[in-house]
Structure formats: structure tokens, C-alpha cells
Amino acid sequence: MVNTTIKTTKSQEIFAAAQNLMPGGVSSPVRAFKSVGGQPIVFDHVKGAYIWDVDGNQYIDYVGTWGPAICGHAHPDVIGALHEALEKGTSFGAPSFLENVLAEMVIAAVPSIEMVRFVNSGTEACMAVLRLMRAFTNREKVIKFEGCYHGHADMFLVKAGSGVATLGLPDSPGVPKSATSSTLTAPYNDLEAVKALFAENRDQIAGVILEPVVGNAGFITPDAGFLEGLRELTHEHGALLVFDEVMTGFRIAYGGAQEKFGVTPDLTTLGKVIGGGLPVGAYGGRRDIMSMIAPAGPVYQAGTLSGNPLAMTAGIKTLELLQKPGAYEYLERITKKLADGLLQVAQETGHAACGGHISAMFGLFFTSGPVHNYEDAKNSDTAKFGRFHRGMLERGVYLAPSQFEAGFTSLAHTDEDIDQTIAIAREVLSSI
């Protein structure tokens, strides 16, 4: 039995059975709590800023289903819209007006996007973008950054973040060398390394893809001039710049990181928030590039459930909620309060810590820092984070079960939630 102060009998029973049914007992690796130890909790239902497990325990949630729940779980407006949409059917496999509506909203919001294609996941969006980059430039090599995660497709599983970082895997078995031979890597925030790669591979690099704010190696922000430098380098070498905004899109600003930092890429991938909690992905960018996608052009990409009416409905309603005056000001205020409070408590209880936030995204590392890249993140005290995570969980706060994942707030979080979280963090950090 797990040593815990909360009742987890049903969670343990369900997870034990799950391990005989699914690899590791989960449908995605990080959910197994491997890097933080202890027993995963099994959810029963969610509402607003809170989750309840099958044993009846309630938690303040800072995972938000890994990002989509920016308006809070099961928002009544989203649920109401979905009920109406369900009456018309769950999937058409044909064009629907809802695709037009969400496409217009995305194009109006994201500076780089003149045309958009909807898919079913962030991984799918990044796979399609990679193919499109290579087709448009007629080049094969792509630069990615250590610790940046662009889904689980073969060509991106090179020094990746997210679950790969959580499990300590440098790469994944089963990925042939040929699949990654054209994937070049550089440390995040290191422009000189990128310059060297361009110099060594002149006229061979199709583009650069990155999380403009890293959320899959913990929360890491771009140094001043880094994004601008990438924009200049890609222009100079005839390569494309791609922002993977699956996590940051509509979260750190309505127009994403590119609006926040004033740097416009050529292509952008999206997901999470634009589906309002349903499976979704999207990629878009300049019209001349996107016009190469079939059936308008020769670059093939397709999907049975792409643009399905339920995901489109949830996405439309979520973006409507985010358009309300004061939404992002509120997210900035409560997230700053949380991030500053956690750092202050860590320092006052004698722990070396660093971290920060941008709008509704935050992170905390147990190291004096600063953390500029994946190597810095790996040098933080992950064992201490595991103890911190468990202590918070046992006292009713659900944080991402990995040091290498960002945290998320929502419009449903209240000042009382933040105050309670900081108070609990003080209690936990005073005891570890």
C-alpha cells in the first residue's frame, strides 16, 4: 500500500487493474506518476478549477487537462453548446459551417495565420507542418531545440521534452536513424548554436521549429532577442520559422506567443485551447505556403475526424469566452500572484528555487537558476520536486506530475484558491 494521508483505495484498485489492460496502466506516460513517485489518482469528475477523484477527494487543479481548460473545467457555456451540437450528430466527415467560424476566429487572432487546416491533435499538426516545410523549401533538414516537444512522431523524438523527459529517455526505441537523420538540434536560447548549424548545412535547412515559450521541459522563457534572432536567421537563409503554439496559443495571449513577443513566424501549430477540451489540432500560416496543402496543392494530409462539429463547437465557445473584456488581465494577475507566492514561500523555507509565469502559464524549479534551457532544467532537484508534488497532492493541490511540465491557471481559479495553494505550499516546503 502507498503511504498517504488521503484515501486512495479505489484509485489503487482501478490503477492496478489498468496495468493489466494498458501499457503502464495509462493512455499517456506522464499520467503514471513515474517521475514523482507514489500512486496516480484516478479522476471521477471535474468542474471549474477543481477535480474529484474516485475516492471523493477534491483538489485545486493546476494541470487543466494539460492546457485546454483555460476557462475552467466543464464551463456551462461550453457544455450547453455541446449539448446542442450533439443533437445534430457527432461527426460529419464532410464540410461544416462550424469550421468556417472557428477558422475565421483563428485567422483574426493569430498574426501569422492567413489560412488554417484543422486536425485532431498537436502531434498531427506538427507532423503535417514538417512535411509542408520540406515541400515548400525543397529542403530536408529541420532544426529543433533540446527539450522542446512537438508530439510523438518519429522525426521529432530527438532530445524531446514532455513525457520523454519525464521518463529520462534520450530518444525512443523503434525510431529508425533514417527518420531523424535530417533533424538537427540546438540548445534553447542559444542563437550561436543555430548560426553554426546554418553555416554547416548551407542551403539544406528547411526551417526552425520551436516552442516559443517552452512548456515541455518545465517552464522556460525566451531570452531577450532570441525569437527575434531566429526570425532574422531564417530570413537570411531562406528557411521557414515555425512556432509550435499548441500550448501557448490563446493561453499567454489571445494571439499567442507571437502576439506577446511581437515576432511573426511563417507557420504555426495549435491545439489544446482551440478545442475547448476536445481532441483538436491545427496548423496555419502564410497563404502561399498553406496553398500547397491538398486538395489545393500537392502536399497530402487528411483526417477522418478533422474539423468534427463537437471540437469546433467547443473551440468557438471557448474563444468567445476569452474575448470577454478583462479575461487575460485576470489570468495575468492570479498567475503572477501564484508564481510569486510559490517562489517567496520556497525562499522563506530555505529552498533554492526559481521560476516565473507568463499570463496563465507558470513553472517552478528547485534550483537557484536561472533556467535557460533543457540542460539547466535537468540539473534542478527533481527528487525534491517529487516530494513537493506528493505533499501538495495529499493536501488537495494537483500539480503536473513531472518537473518537466508547465503549470496552468484558468478563469475559474479564484484568489481564495491561490491563497490556499500558497499556504499549503508553505506547509509542504517546511516539511521536506
From Swiss-Prot:
<dbReference type="InterPro" id="IPR015424">
    <property type="entry name" value="PyrdxlP-dep_Trfase"/>
</dbReference>
<comment type="subunit">
    <text>Homodimer.</text>
</comment>
<dbReference type="InterPro" id="IPR049704">
    <property type="entry name" value="Aminotrans_3_PPA_site"/>
</dbReference>
<dbReference type="GO" id="GO:0042286">
    <property type="term" value="F:glutamate-1-semialdehyde 2,1-aminomutase activity"/>
</dbReference>
<keyword id="KW-0627">Porphyrin biosynthesis</keyword>
<comment type="pathway">
    <text>Porphyrin-containing compound metabolism; chlorophyll biosynthesis.</text>
</comment>
<protein>
    <recommendedName>
        <fullName>Glutamate-1-semialdehyde 2,1-aminomutase</fullName>
        <ecNumber>5.4.3.8</ecNumber>
    </recommendedName>
</protein>
<dbReference type="Pfam" id="PF00202">
    <property type="entry name" value="Aminotran_3"/>
</dbReference>
<keyword id="KW-0963">Cytoplasm</keyword>
<dbReference type="InterPro" id="IPR015422">
    <property type="entry name" value="PyrdxlP-dep_Trfase_small"/>
</dbReference>
<comment type="similarity">
    <text>Belongs to the class-III pyridoxal-phosphate-dependent aminotransferase family. HemL subfamily.</text>
</comment>
<dbReference type="GO" id="GO:0015995">
    <property type="term" value="P:chlorophyll biosynthetic process"/>
</dbReference>
<dbReference type="GO" id="GO:0005737">
    <property type="term" value="C:cytoplasm"/>
</dbReference>
<feature type="modified residue" description="N6-(pyridoxal phosphate)lysine">
    <location>
        <position position="272"/>
    </location>
</feature>
<dbReference type="GO" id="GO:0006782">
    <property type="term" value="P:protoporphyrinogen IX biosynthetic process"/>
</dbReference>
<keyword id="KW-0149">Chlorophyll biosynthesis</keyword>
<keyword id="KW-0663">Pyridoxal phosphate</keyword>
<dbReference type="GO" id="GO:0030170">
    <property type="term" value="F:pyridoxal phosphate binding"/>
</dbReference>
<dbReference type="GO" id="GO:0008483">
    <property type="term" value="F:transaminase activity"/>
</dbReference>
<dbReference type="InterPro" id="IPR015421">
    <property type="entry name" value="PyrdxlP-dep_Trfase_major"/>
</dbReference>
<comment type="pathway">
    <text>Porphyrin-containing compound metabolism; protoporphyrin-IX biosynthesis; 5-aminolevulinate from L-glutamyl-tRNA(Glu): step 2/2.</text>
</comment>
<keyword id="KW-0413">Isomerase</keyword>
<dbReference type="InterPro" id="IPR005814">
    <property type="entry name" value="Aminotrans_3"/>
</dbReference>
<dbReference type="InterPro" id="IPR004639">
    <property type="entry name" value="4pyrrol_synth_GluAld_NH2Trfase"/>
</dbReference>
